[in-house]
Amino acid sequence: MPRETGRRLIAQNKRARHDYDILDTYEAGLVLRGTEVKALRAGRASLVDGFAQISDGEIWLHNVHIPEYTEGTWTNHAPRRKRKMLLHRAEIEKLVGKTQEGGLTLVPLSLYWKDGRAKIEIALARGRKSYDKRHAIAERDAAREIGRAMGRRAKGRYL
């Protein structure tokens, strides 16, 4: 059987783009156990409460829920265990410097398969206040309305 190519999405954290201003994104590998891989192959995971933390020069992913594999036995994994992320040393050092500035955090954006390996996209992000969220929603709605008006104009329908 040939290896799968491309990028196949497993889970996405849509809430993160609403709650945070995304400054930079990174792709990282994950250290997983066998039953976790099988659960991910079934397309089951949740990134909603997830975050990444740096300790001892390593990046750890916390609170990402990968449910137990239904066919697993006593060797099954804990659903919310912390998982090590694989990044280049230079990327880790850059992230250490930026997260220590204050106000910045690492949040997972998406979990996907890339060439048969589980990858996670993490973002260096700054939390938004509630008024910033409302402002972003208003801007998005205005842009959508402008796009609709331009589309009607292009089709020859005014109003």
Curated annotation (Swiss-Prot):
Record-level GO cellular component terms: cytosol
CDD domains documented for this protein: SmpB
Signal peptide coordinates: none
Any one GO MF annotation of this record: RNA binding
InterPro entries: SmpB, SsrA-bd_prot, SsrA-bd_prot_CS
Biological process per Gene Ontology, one example term: trans-translation
Pfam families named in the record: SmpB
Subcellular location: Cytoplasm
Keywords associated with the record: Cytoplasm, RNA-binding
Highest taxon, organism lineage: Bacteria
Family assignment from sequence similarity: Belongs to the SmpB family.
PANTHER family named among the record's database cross-references: SSRA-BINDING PROTEIN, TMRNA-BINDING COMPONENT OF TRANS-TRANSLATION TAGGING COMPLEX
Primary role: Required for rescue of stalled ribosomes mediated by trans-translation. Binds to transfer-messenger RNA (tmRNA), required for stable association of tmRNA with ribosomes. tmRNA and SmpB together mimic tRNA shape, replacing the anticodon stem-loop with SmpB. tmRNA is encoded by the ssrA gene; the 2 termini fold to resemble tRNA(Ala) and it encodes a 'tag peptide', a short internal open reading frame. During trans-translation Ala-aminoacylated tmRNA acts like a tRNA, entering the A-site of stalled ribosomes, displacing the stalled mRNA.
Protein name: SsrA-binding protein
Organism: Frankia casuarinae (strain DSM 45818 / CECT 9043 / HFP020203 / CcI3)
Gene: smpB
